[in-house]
């Protein structure tokens, strides 16, 4: 086995360690709450009615939390469609060229009919040498997944998966339901935590689980609250984690709110128009992940045309293919109008959650 293949296998194996840790904590919390608290402590003290109410509410939060977590982990990241790949002849010409200017000319012609409005910082076509494709707007190469991810937000070790266009809604719901889960557990355990702490209750075995359950749920609540608040702010601004650290550069300059259409429309881009699906971990996000409306809509007829097509693309339900609009109908006048591309600049993907040093997004004149 080649060293690089062995190393990648080790990476994939180690990547499941954080997921197994979270799974262990969740399974233990289920046992501690259901068995030690509700069955032994509450029922043992004649509080059967309260135990039933607690169990019903607990399982509601537990099911939604596990469902969202599962979807975040096992939803495959969406990658660019074949329209963004170079043809065999274009790829052959590109590989034979030693001049970066000539390579960029080949990429520019290939990207002319694609709905692309972003470039690298040096005004070059964003091309992934590893995947051998032209990157759509907001797409980036993830070194951990070894593929280009549509609307990549970050690679999250706690789910061992890339968070992007296909599962960003699931990730937000995972944070939301984990927050509610921890809050519910902490608030309902608190009074028994006090009783065990003051030795009013003397069950030694249940005491350990109840005391530890309160500390763990409170700790995770504080941690998840800060992370969820940050991502809610990102959704309201229509930014990814990558874009929050490096604002996209448009034809008029750097603008961190370049993709923002207003708070309401920004939220609907992630959660969709159907309110009945908002709190369910099923795919309902707007668009196809390959093109996104910007604040240029209304002033640039070409951009408006692309945006209208993107708005009409919907997919509801998990594990369904994402509809791709006919790219040939969306000629990119921005790329076509630029007569010359500057020297190519490199661009890296993101390999970990919360990093700030990988991506530049820009739009050419």
Swiss-Prot record:
One GO process term, biological-process aspect: protein palmitoylation
Pfam families with a match to the protein in the record: DHHC
Record's comment on post-translational modification: Autopalmitoylated (in vitro).
Residues in DHHC domain copies: 126-176
Keywords linked to the UniProt accession: Acyltransferase, Cell membrane, Cytoplasm, Endoplasmic reticulum, Golgi apparatus, Lipoprotein, Membrane, Metal-binding, Palmitate, Phosphoprotein, Transferase, Transmembrane, Transmembrane helix, Zinc
Gene Ontology MF annotations: protein-cysteine S-myristoyltransferase activity; protein-cysteine S-palmitoyltransferase activity; protein-cysteine S-stearoyltransferase activity; zinc ion binding
Bilayer topology: Multi-pass membrane protein
Site note Important for selectivity toward medium-length fatty acids, residues: 29, 181
Residue spans, topological domain Cytoplasmic: 1-14, 75-169, 232-365
EC nos: 2.3.1.225, 2.3.1.-
Enzyme class, UniProt record, top EC level: transferase
Active site: 156
Region of interest (Disordered), residue spans: 301-365
PROSITE patterns assigned: DHHC
Protein role: Palmitoyltransferase that could catalyze the addition of palmitate onto various protein substrates. Catalyzes palmitoylation of Cys residues in the cytoplasmic C-terminus of EGFR, and modulates the duration of EGFR signaling by modulating palmitoylation-dependent EGFR internalization and degradation. Has a preference for acyl-CoA with C16 fatty acid chains. Can also utilize acyl-CoA with C14 and C18 fatty acid chains. May palmitoylate CALHM1 subunit of gustatory voltage-gated ion channels and modulate channel gating and kinetics.
Record's comment describing the protein's domains: The DHHC domain is required for palmitoyltransferase activity.
PANTHER family given in the database record: PALMITOYLTRANSFERASE ZDHHC16
The protein's name: Palmitoyltransferase ZDHHC20
């Amino acid at each position: 086995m080649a060293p690089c293949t062995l190393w990648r296998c080790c990476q994939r194996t180690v990547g499941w360690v954080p997921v197994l840790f979270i799974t262990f904590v969740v399974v233990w919390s289920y046992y501690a709450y259901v068995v030690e608290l509700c069955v032994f402590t509450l029922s043992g003290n004649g509080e059967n009615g309260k135990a039933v109410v607690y169990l019903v509410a607990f399982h509601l939060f537990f099911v939604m939390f596990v469902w969202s977590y599962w979807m975040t982990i096992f939803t495959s990241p969406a990658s660019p469609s074949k329209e963004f790949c170079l043809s065999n002849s274009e790829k052959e010409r590109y590989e034979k060229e030693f001049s970066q200017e000539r390579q960029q000319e080949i990429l520019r012609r290939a990207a002319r009919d694609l709905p692309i409005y972003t470039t690298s910082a040096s005004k070059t076509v964003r091309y992934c040498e590893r995947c051998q494709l032209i990157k759509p707007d907001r797409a980036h190469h993830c070194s951990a997944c070894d593929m280009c991810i549509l609307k990549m937000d970050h690679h999250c070790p706690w789910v061992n998966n890339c968070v992007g266009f296909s599962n960003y809604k699931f990730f937000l719901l995972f944070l939301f339901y984990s927050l509610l889960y921890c809050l519910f557990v902490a608030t309902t355990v608190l009074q028994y935590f006090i009783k065990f702490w003051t030795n009013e209750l003397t069950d030694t075995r249940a005491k350990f689980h109840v005391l530890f359950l309160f500390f763990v749920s409170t700790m995770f609540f504080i941690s998840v609250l800060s992370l969820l608040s940050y991502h809610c702010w990102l959704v309201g601004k229509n930014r990814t984690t990558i874009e929050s650290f490096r604002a996209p550069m448009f034809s008029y300059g750097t603008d961190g709110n370049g993709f923002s259409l207003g708070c309401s429309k920004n939220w609907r881009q992630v959660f969709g128009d159907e309110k009945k699906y908002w709190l369910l971990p099923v795919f309902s996000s707007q668009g196809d992940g390959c093109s996104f409306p910007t604040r240029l809509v209304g002033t640039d007829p070409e951009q408006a045309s692309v945006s209208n097509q993107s708005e009409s693309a919907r997919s509801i339900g998990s594990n369904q293919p994402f509809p791709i609009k006919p790219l040939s109908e969306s000629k990119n006048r921005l790329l076509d109008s630029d007569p010359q591309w500057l020297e190519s600049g490199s661009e890296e993907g993101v390999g970990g959650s919360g990093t700030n040093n990988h991506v530049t997004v820009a739009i050419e004149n």
